[in-house]
């Protein structure tokens, strides 16, 4: 934009000079004034752009898109392409499994990131015989596309391309506890058909609140027979184990060329360069880490990350993502049980030279680094991992057990659900429980999924804390059905991060900020109703700080109501002193706290909402209030929403169905916002 402004202001006086003889002296004067005003305006606007007054999240330039995925498919003899919209890696994993399946049917597949290609090329796909495009699309947050599928989503909304002749199928990944279950998968499936593409198999809807793996397997085992029937092909054999990567051990590697945990650019942690994002996180120093609650049953914590000199900007309601590290004790045990030297420098290189994904994680590196920073070793492995590992079990009964759990039989699915998923058995536990299962460590590293960033609602306002990001979290620790004690990867890791001490050592956290739609109203006079039990209070600490700051600036601020819930006042009442101070100062108009275990009958936030229903209705209907809900999606968010249905129905007054529509319209208008998790 800046270049175009400079070009315009430079050429305009010349154009005026050519025509000036056609006008009177008065006209010339007027033109001179106009030119002067325009020139000044352009220069002034240019200066304002160089120093924006609004906060904007820094993002990297979009990746360079390859010229044509269709041409690449032709060149490499592929006829199936599986695009994935993935935020946590699961959709990408499913896409890889589908593309790998293709060889069983005499077809060749490839998985692809839609961010790397121009999807307008879809119209050329019918040029390839028996071609098929599959989309594994996750839904993020409240019905949004994942980051890497945003451009594809925008293109689908705007395009009118004719996709006649394109054959497609869609598998969506979602969670039924969310309002917009599988919105992205449903939209892609519907929109492709509207553009003329032909669906060859029904839309699959995976539910992460249930058993996503089983949903995918059930869809997949019906999908391939449908593909065979449509294209007139037959399966060429049973599912087989085919290595995707080959191991290369580096005997004399320069350590300066070895990855030590970086997510993108080699040595990026030693030489930090903005902008910072998922592929280039900022190493933030921990400046505060304190326990928020009393007692020993749980550990709720408040952390502060220093973002000085990072140029990172955030708004109240945004999310901070952190890249955690696995427990070194677990990593060492895996190395010991497999008899592996974890400090060997190695690379896993893709056997498919045409693939964009050259390595499963940054290489060259060591097994120790891979298992610590790059691979997920604490979540239950998926069935395809068990299938691949089974070949390394020397005891027939153990091999049979693994094969059964990886099968699509009803008995196998039940066994996998109970023994792996519900028992929360991670890879180390499986290796411990199967003494004869000893896979090569390089193949295990190939099979394990990537360790993903963890997202937290930011618990601060940049107006008050421009150089720090605050996190409120609970350390996850529980006894699994297997009898083992499992701990949350990120929260256990964060809990151990001590602020800089006298010795000058700094605890660092790789992080970046992700923009959110969870925003305070544009007008400060708009009332806000905040509902957030437990750590759901996090974004509201930022909201309240910002409303208090606005008051200090002399701005008129509307009513600010908080409905907070915890167990007991003397146990887990988070930010008690801060909230009391905000209430006393008037920044927080109402502080309503529900204690669920302090009396004989349990009191939850929805009970307090019901108590105040008449005032809440006035704020919503007459005051244009915005409602914000943060916390548990499975129970709390639904109960709160049902309470608002009841309030609207009572004071509308209107039928329940009309009340539901009323609240849904509030959501559409951005007046009822959710920041929830399951």
From Swiss-Prot:
Query: Which spans are transmembrane here?
Result: 23-43
**Any note on cofactor binding?**
Binds 1 FAD per monomer. Binds 1 FMN per monomer.
EC number(s)?
A: 1.6.2.4
- Keywords (A to Z) from UniProt: Acetylation, Endoplasmic reticulum, FAD, Flavoprotein, FMN, Membrane, NADP, Oxidoreductase, Transmembrane, Transmembrane helix
Give binding positions for FAD: 424, 454-457, 472-474, 478, 488-491, 677
Show the catalytic activity. Answer: 2 oxidized [cytochrome P450] + NADPH = 2 reduced [cytochrome P450] + NADP(+) + H(+)
> So where does FMN get bound?
86-91, 138-141, 173-182, 208
Ranges in the Cytoplasmic compartment?
44-678
Query: Where in the cell?
Result: Endoplasmic reticulum membrane
Single GO BP term: electron transport chain
Is Signal a UniProt keyword of this protein? no
Q: Topology relative to the membrane, per the entry?
A: Single-pass membrane protein
Cite the ranges annotated as topological domain Lumenal: 2-22
List, for all copies, the residue spans of the domain called Flavodoxin-like. 80-224
* Modified-residue entries (N-acetylglycine), positions: 2
Which function does this protein serve? This enzyme is required for electron transfer from NADP to cytochrome P450 in microsomes. It can also provide electron transfer to heme oxygenase and cytochrome B5.
The Swiss-Prot or TrEMBL record describes its family as follows: Belongs to the NADPH--cytochrome P450 reductase family. In the N-terminal section; belongs to the flavodoxin family.
The name of this protein is NADPH--cytochrome P450 reductase
């Amino acid at each position: 934009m800046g270049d175009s402004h400079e070009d315009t202001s430079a050429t305009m006086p010349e154009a005026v000079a050519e025509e000036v003889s056609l006008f009177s002296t008065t006209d010339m004067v007027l033109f001179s004034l106009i030119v002067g005003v325009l020139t000044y305006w352009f220069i002034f606007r240019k200066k304002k752009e160089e120093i924006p007054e609004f906060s904007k999240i820094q993002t990297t330039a979009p990746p360079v898109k390859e010229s044509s995925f269709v041409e690449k498919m032709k060149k490499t003899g592929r006829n199936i392409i599986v695009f994935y919209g993935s935020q946590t890696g699961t959709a990408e994993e499913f896409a890889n499994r589908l593309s790998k399946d293709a060889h069983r049917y005499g077809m060749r597949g490839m998985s692809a990131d839609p961010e790397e290609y121009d999807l307008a090329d879809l119209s050329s796909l019918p040029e390839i015989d028996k071609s098929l495009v599959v989309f594994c699309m996750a839904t993020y947050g409240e019905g949004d596309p994942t980051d890497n599928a945003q451009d594809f989503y925008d293109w689908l909304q705007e395009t009118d391309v004719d996709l006649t002749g394109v054959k497609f199928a869609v598998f969506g990944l979602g969670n039924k506890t969310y309002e917009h279950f599988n919105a992205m998968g449903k939209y892609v499936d519907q929109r492709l058909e509207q553009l003329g593409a032909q669906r060859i198999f029904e839309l699959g809807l995976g539910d992460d609140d249930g058993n996503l793996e089983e949903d995918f397997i059930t869809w997949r085992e019906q999908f391939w027979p449908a593909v065979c029937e449509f294209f007139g092909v037959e399966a060429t054999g049973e599912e087989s184990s085919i290595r995707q990567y080959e191991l290369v051990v580096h005997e004399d590697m320069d350590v300066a060329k070895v990855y030590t945990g970086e997510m993108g650019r080699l040595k990026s942690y030693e030489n930090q360069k903005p902008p910072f994002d998922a592929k280039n996180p900022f190493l933030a120093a921990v400046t505060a880490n304190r326990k928020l609650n009393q007692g020993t049953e749980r550990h709720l914590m408040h952390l502060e990350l220093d973002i000085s000199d990072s140029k990172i900007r955030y708004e109240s309601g945004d999310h901070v993502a952190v890249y955690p590290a696995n427990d070194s004790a677990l990593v060492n045990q895996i190395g010991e049980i497999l008899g592996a030297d974890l400090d060997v420098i190695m690379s896993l290189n893709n056997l498919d030279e045409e693939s964009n994904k050259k390595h499963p994680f940054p290489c060259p590196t060591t097994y120790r680094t891979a298992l610590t920073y790059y691979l997920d070793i604490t979540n239950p492995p998926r069935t395809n991992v068990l299938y691949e590992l089974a070949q390394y079990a020397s005891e027939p009964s153990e091999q049979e057990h693994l094969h059964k759990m990886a099968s699509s039989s009803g008995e196998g699915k039940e066994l996998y659900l109970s023994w792996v998923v519900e028992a929360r058995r991670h890879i180390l536990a499986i290796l411990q429980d199967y003494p004869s299962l000893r896979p090569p460590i390089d193949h295990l590293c190939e099979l394990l999924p990537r360790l993903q960033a963890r997202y937290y609602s930011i618990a601060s306002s940049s107006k008050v804390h421009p150089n720090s990001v605050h996190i409120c979290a609970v350390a996850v620790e529980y006894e699994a059905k297997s009898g083992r004690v499992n701990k949350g990867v990120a929260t256990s890791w964060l809990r151990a991060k001590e602020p800089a001490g006298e010795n000058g050592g700094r605890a660092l956290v790789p992080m970046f900020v992700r923009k959110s739609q969870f925003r305070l109203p544009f007008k400060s006079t708009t009332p806000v109703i905040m509902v957030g039990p437990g750590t759901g209070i996090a974004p509201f600490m930022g909201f309240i700080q910002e409303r208090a700051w606005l008051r200090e600036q002399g701005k008129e601020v509307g009513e600010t109501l908080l409905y907070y819930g915890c167990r007991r006042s003397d146990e887990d009442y988070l930010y008690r002193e801060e909230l009391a101070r905000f209430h006393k100062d008037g920044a927080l108009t109402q502080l309503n706290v529900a204690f669920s275990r302090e009396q004989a009958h349990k009191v939850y936030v929805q009970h307090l909402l019901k108590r105040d229903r008449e005032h809440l209705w006035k704020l919503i209907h007459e005051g244009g209030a915005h409602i914000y809900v943060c916390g548990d999606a499975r129970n709390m968010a639904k109960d709160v929403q049902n309470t608002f249905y009841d309030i609207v129905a009572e004071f509308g007054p209107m039928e329940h169905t009309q009340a539901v529509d009323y609240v849904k319209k509030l959501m559409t208008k951005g007046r009822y916002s959710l920041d929830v998790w399951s």
